[in-house]
Amino acid sequence: MSRGALIVFEGLDKSGKTTQCMNIMESIPSNTIKYLNFPQRSTVTGKMIDDYLTRKKTYNDHIVNLLFCANRWEFASFIQEQLEQGITLIVDRYAFSGVAYAAAKGAPMTLSKSYESGLPKPDLVIFLESGSKEINRNVGEEIYEDVEFQQKVLQEYKKMIEEGDIHWQIISSEFEEDVKKELIKNIVIEAMHTVTGPVGQLWM
């Protein structure tokens, strides 16, 4: 039995990640594809993250970085098992978000990557570009919903994309929504059909 593909959606806040993930789940109906999003706010670490994001509690930046990382590690075994059972996972945010946001707040990228090292490695990362309209819409109740900060996050994403050690697919913000939806669906289907070999380990 061939394994499933680990397909991650990344991008700035309000770039449409969740919408595109849901489009995939609706347009590729199958019992061999599942959706997972981070942070998972139902766990112990997830509830602490939710309190932080909604400004109910404050933590220093190092603790925040570790909380987000621990939240992903809580699901590392689940992800590995699902992929080995032939289940493709569509993941809304992953380690790249953690590294980009931490680096935007001043944490060394190499340090943040070391926390995530060994997580299941994505077969494909789809990065949704944000147009000026979406970026300027990044003002909200949660702590990171700030235009200036989001621009810093974008620069950190670009650094990771340029490294070339991960298969990134950048989706332009200039596409019409129906064109974008169809393009992403085709990219995901191709990734599902061409995945080979064992599950890799991220940043090892």
UniProtKB/Swiss-Prot annotation:
The protein's name: Thymidylate kinase
PANTHER family: THYMIDYLATE KINASE (PTHR10344:SF1)
First-tier enzyme category under EC: transferase
Alphabetized PROSITE patterns for the sequence: THYMIDYLATE_KINASE (PS01331)
EC number annotated for this UniProt entry: 2.7.4.9
A Pfam family per the record: Thymidylate_kin
Any one GO molecular function term: ATP binding
Family (UniProt): Belongs to the thymidylate kinase family.
GO biological process, one term: dTDP biosynthetic process
Keyword annotations from UniProtKB, A to Z: ATP-binding, Kinase, Nucleotide biosynthesis, Nucleotide-binding, Transferase
Residues reported to bind ATP: G11, L12, D13, K14, S15, G16, K17, T18
Catalysed reactions listed for this entry: dTMP + ATP = dTDP + ADP
InterPro entries given in the database record: P-loop_NTPase, Thymidylate_kin-like_dom, Thymidylate_kin_CS, Thymidylate_kinase
Pathway per the UniProt entry: Pyrimidine metabolism; dTTP biosynthesis
Gene name of the record: TMK
